[in-house]
Amino acid sequence: MKFHSAADFVADGLRRLSVFFSPAWWRAFQPARTRISTRERLRLVIGALIGIFLTGLLCHLIGGDDLKRLPWLVAPLGASAVLVFALPASPMAQPWAVVGGNTLSALVGIVGVHGVYLLGAPELAAALAVATAIALMLTLRCLHPPGGATALMMVLGEIRDPSFALCPVLLNCILLVLA
């Protein structure tokens, strides 16, 4: 196409780009509407609320003075709660996946922290920890997406103590599954 002026060139470009600004184009990115009833939505939300609250409360009571130096909830537990309460039939929300995936990933992340010092590159250690956690979760059939976040959290938080994988990670997971 030949343009007679810069204005023609700009006008043609804007005309071609207008398709990206049309409401129909943006609607294509929206997820399909869910058919979850209001009652079911409330059950999911209240389940997650009670699950996280009880997990935090029981960990705080069980941990006692140790919790002055440790958190009693780990952040990836929020994502685990979404799976457990919103997708309870999912293989990734089953007890073995939640408990095994997060705990295994915590241990892998702790090893990854030591790798930071060997490799001298925290980015590489973080990437290796997440990739290794995924590989091991697949091998042990306990794939749980928040486990990747758990491994990453350990490396980024420079958590070196293996007991952190037991308390709070393992304890959090067991209590959430029981909630």
Question: What is the predicted role of each segment?
Answer:
Residues 88-97, 136-147:
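Membrane-helix interface "capping/anchor" motifs
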